[in-house]
């Protein structure tokens, strides 16, 4: 389990003993164990066989594939799980960016793999993607419903992610190791949707991560890690706008626990509660999943992220040597 949040305690011939996050115990157990009727060890540990299956209390390999359970929980937050629900319940407000979801058949996924290898793609798939781009308004951002190809930007392979034709869109997806990971891997949970999303040129400094636990907004932090004087100057305006958004959004929030990425722009029109806030995406919650905690720390800030009565708001501060 690469990059596992679980601590390896010891390794035996037939299994490995891991400890799981004690501070997020209830959430962890509910998602990964209770639903499958797995008994829990009193010492906060579980045993995993060499094949990746949970060992029961009789030291027998169960049929419960641990990483499959974890990945299936992460997949609950993919775009196709929440987009239509938000649009249906947003009362015709601009709540997230216009998106066209294209469900991929096994044949389509094979065609994308063949394009990555041989550079050939069926005209029928090109037409479906081109039609979706036209429907969105000709300038789009493309991703799988699991991941975006932002690794290409981080690696300086491209300047931005906007596309206006199907061939460019397919090339971005198949060039991105991040996207290919969930399209072509041997994982039991793979992405079966392309998401053609409206491309809007926005200031990413105004992106924020919201932490929702037990249906309550507990904390908010800027998505970036660098000090931004403009954000500090507008701190109250931004915080008030996010709370104004949440005042209406909490009744339709699709998840009891999640991290929610949003963006603020005072030029946004017809937003929920006139908040100038739009939802970008949802991700999982807790150190046992795959979403990071931004400026917070899952362990150190456990009480704040799960029990805060008033949403905590955090911006990056100046490094001490520059003050």
Curated annotation (Swiss-Prot):
It holds the Pfam family D123. This is Putative CDC123-like protein L884. It comes from the Viruses. Signal peptide: none annotated. Belongs to the CDC123 family.
